[in-house]
Design a protein with these regions (language model features):
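Helical "substrate-binding/catalytic lid" subdomain
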Residues: 51, 70-179
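Rossmann-fold dinucleotide-binding core
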Residues: 2-81
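A broad, low-specificity signal for short, low-complexity segments enriched in glycine/proline
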Residues: 1-3, 111-112
Length: 179
């Protein structure tokens, strides 16, 4: 993830040279990249998007042209804000279950069939419960992405109080050696 401002600056430099440019961040992590299952959020001119779509399709399961240059990065910021909040909520929910004397596996079996279901729940709950920190996305990278999103929020006036709090929690994980 990069800032929308950087994407716009690169676009300007590319345009000066007569080169088309798209900002097209991805979601899906290493496993998604290895399996051609990435989700791509594309910002840029519609004509450039149409010319590049077949190439992007070779490594993506989903491609969405979300708007002009910079929009791809902004959509990725939304993705990261959501993931950070979901992971925090899942972690706290599982902690609550353990403290309440519930079997986390049974709780997950139940709630994963309802409105709380998410990719993070399906793929991360076991490592959280077992204390096996298997970061598919490093803490440092999440902090970078949240920092970019929070900076953009300061520019556009969005209030992201929960994201600020979750970012502080990630900072605590970093302070304990999480990378």
């Amino acid at each position: 993830t990069a800032s929308a401002t950087i994407a716009r600056e690169i676009h300007g430099a590319a345009e000066d040279k007569g080169v088309g440019f798209l900002d097209a961040p991805v979601s899906g992590g290493q496993a998604g990249a290895e399996n051609g299952q990435l989700t791509v959020m594309v910002g840029g001119d519609a004509g450039n998007f149409e010319r590049a779509e077949r190439v992007i399709d070779s490594y993506a399961k989903a491609i969405t042209h979300v708007g002009p240059v910079g929009s791809g990065q902004l959509a990725k910021m939304v993705n990261q804000i959501c993931i950070a909040g979901i992971v925090q909520g899942l972690s706290e929910g599982l902690h609550f279950a353990k403290c309440a004397g519930l079997d986390p596996a049974l709780v997950i079996e139940s709630i994963s069939k309802g409105a709380a279901q998410s990719w993070q729940m399906d793929n991360r709950w076991r490592t959280m419960v077992d204390g096996e920190i298997d970061f598919g996305f490093a803490v440092d990278w999440m902090r970078k992405d949240l920092g970019i999103a929070l900076e953009e929020a300061r520019r556009n006036g969005a209030r992201l109080e929960l994201t600020e709090l979750v970012d502080r929690f990630y900072a605590e994980v970093q302070a304990m050696g999480g990378r």
